[in-house]
Each structure stands twice: as C-alpha cells, then as structure tokens.
C-alpha cells in the first residue's frame, strides 16, 4: 500500500529522533522503566546533630546510608556510630587532612591503618570503605588499601553525574567514582551540598542542579550531604527531603547499591582520574551563619 511504503520510509527518521530524545532524557516512558540506583552518603567533620537528624529521617523511610565521619567526631560520639553500624549503616574511614595524591606509600599506609583501627574499635565491624580529602587517591592508596584488606576507596567523579565502580586488574580494592557536577565558573565537584555551597550555589540552585540530575535517568548516582549543612539548614534540607521522595530513584543501602552497579574492570592505567579542585577556599553566596536553621536546631551552636 502507498501509505505503508511512505510510513516505512519515515520509520528510520522517527527511530533516530526517539533515540536522540532518549539520550538527553526527554522521553518520560523510557525514563520511568528503570529507577535510578541511588546511594545517600553523609560526611561529618563537626558535631552530631546533623547526623542524628538524617538518621531520624532515613529511619522513617526504612533507609540507611554510607557515613564518613572524621576521627574527632567518631571519638566524641562513639555510641552514635556504634548504633548506626548496628542499624545497618556502613561507616567509612576518612583522612580529611590532605588529599592522597602523590603521597608516599608508607605515609598513606600508616594514616589509613590509624583510621581503620579507630572505626573498627567503635563499630566492631570491618572498615570496608576509605576516602581522603576531596576523594583523592593514587596507586599508593590502592596498594595500602589492599594491604589492609579495605574493599573500596572513594574517587572523584570521572563520568559526570553517573556514579560508577572501577576494578583495577592489578588490585583487589575497587574505586567508587562518585557523582560529579559542574557549577558556574567554579569547575566540577561532588553532587553534594557543601561542594555546591562552596562554589557559590544557593539551596535553590542546588535544588535545580539535583532535579536535572534525577530527571536524566542515570543508572547509578551518589548523593552526598555534609550533615552539618544539609542536615541542619532548612533551605538545603528541603532539597534532600524532595529527593528522598522522588519516585524515579530507588534509595539503596551501601550493600544493595554496590551489588547493582556494573563493575568496570580494566588496567589501572586506563581508569580515568579526576584531580580538579577549584574550590579549595570556599566562596559561598550565603555564609553558614546567615542560613536559616531547621526549627529544632535554632539557637544551637554547631
């Protein structure tokens, strides 16, 4: 039939358009088929109020998170982290003093061992994840992690907002590449309240960035919060509250998340590395002291 021949001639064009729209995230029916595999990661350098608030909110939703707490916080609030570990939270070690780029192996090993012992003394569970400042790592980090039996090190994002896992063939330790997003002229950084705040973002702008990421249909992502920011301040917490209710994301425990991510096994030399940090000195649009706290934290110092 003439009309059928005409339709057949146009079918490749329609198909090409559909594929193009799918790639940029404009086909809702395709987007709705597979929810994003999402992981919440909490970081704490200060006190405990933000972590406790996150714990309450996640508990109401039947969720847990990956938590990185600096050694001083672990030591000051050991009962909290013992409880969190018992509830199923994965407690990661962190050395925030320096990025582990081009740091001697012996120093990395000693620092990592100290962190591991501190975490395990409190949680009574093996420390499976480690990260340094800016999620920096190099081959010495992998060597040290292998020597200490640490399963994962955290790395700066190398695939945009897509979070992924690399398995260097030379090592047993895997690299978790976190979600990474650009902002203005301040380069790229983690999909994280502090990272965006330090680059001059407001809570409203963070909401816009995150909304676009969640709508893009990524297979896997990591949403990070410095709990003393996102867990305490109203404008920033509301962004996370909305994200937790997003029907296009399945928020997973750490074990569920890593088991669902496709592992990229390749030689270390072929694994991409990101060393860009343009916000070493924060340049916030609104300083912390001028942000409005959540009602239950007003009048408290942190």
Positions of predicted regions on the chain:
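N-terminal secretory signal peptides that target proteins for export/translocation
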Residues: 1-10
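Bacterial N-terminal signal peptides
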Residues: 14-25
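Boundary/entry segment of secreted carbohydrate-active catalytic domains
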Residues: 32-53, 289-299
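C-terminal domain-boundary segment and adjacent tail
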Residues: 58-65, 73-76, 83, 152-158, ...
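Metal-dependent polysaccharide deacetylase catalytic core of the NodB/CE4 family, i.e.
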Residues: 61-141, 160-164, 171-194, 219-226, ...
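Short, surface-exposed basic-aromatic patches at helix termini and helix-loop junctions that form
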Residues: 82-87, 142-151, 168, 241-245
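Aromatic-anchored helix/helix-loop segment that forms the rim or "lid"
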Residues: 183-214
């Amino acid at each position: 039939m003439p009309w059928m021949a005409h339709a057949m001639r146009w079918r490749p064009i329609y198909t090409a358009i559909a594929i193009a729209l799918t790639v940029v995230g404009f086909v809702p029916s395709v987007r709705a088929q597979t929810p994003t595999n999402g992981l919440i990661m909490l970081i704490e350098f200060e006190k405990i109020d933000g972590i406790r608030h996150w714990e309450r909110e996640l508990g109401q939703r039947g969720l847990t998170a990956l938590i990185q707490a600096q050694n001083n916080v672990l030591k000051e609030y050991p009962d909290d982290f013992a409880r969190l570990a018992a509830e199923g939270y994965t407690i990661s070690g962190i050395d925030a003093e320096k990025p582990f780029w081009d740091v001697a192996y012996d120093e990395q090993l000693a620092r990592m061992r100290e962190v591991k012992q501190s975490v395990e003394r409190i949680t009574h569970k093996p420390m499976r994840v480690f990260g340094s400042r800016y999620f920096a790592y190099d081959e010495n980090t992998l060597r040290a992690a292998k020597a200490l039996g640490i399963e994962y090190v955290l790395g700066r994002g190398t695939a945009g907002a897509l979070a992924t896992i690399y398995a260097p063939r030379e090592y047993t330790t895997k690299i978790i590449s976190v979600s990474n997003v650009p902002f203005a002229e301040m380069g790229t950084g983690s999909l994280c309240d502090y990272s965006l705040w330090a680059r001059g973002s407001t809570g409203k702008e963070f909401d816009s960035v995150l909304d676009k990421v969640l709508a893009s249909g990524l297979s896997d992502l990591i949403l990070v919060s410095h709990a003393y920011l996102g867990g305490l301040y109203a404008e920033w917490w509301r962004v996370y509250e909305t994200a937790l209710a997003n029907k296009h994301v399945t928020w997973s425990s750490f074990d569920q998340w890593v088991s669902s991510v496709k592992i990229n096994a390749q030689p270390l030399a072929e694994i991409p590395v990101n060393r860009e940090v343009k916000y070493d000195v924060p340049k916030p649009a609104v300083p912390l002291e001028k942000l409005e706290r959540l009602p239950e934290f007003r009048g408290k110092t942190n």
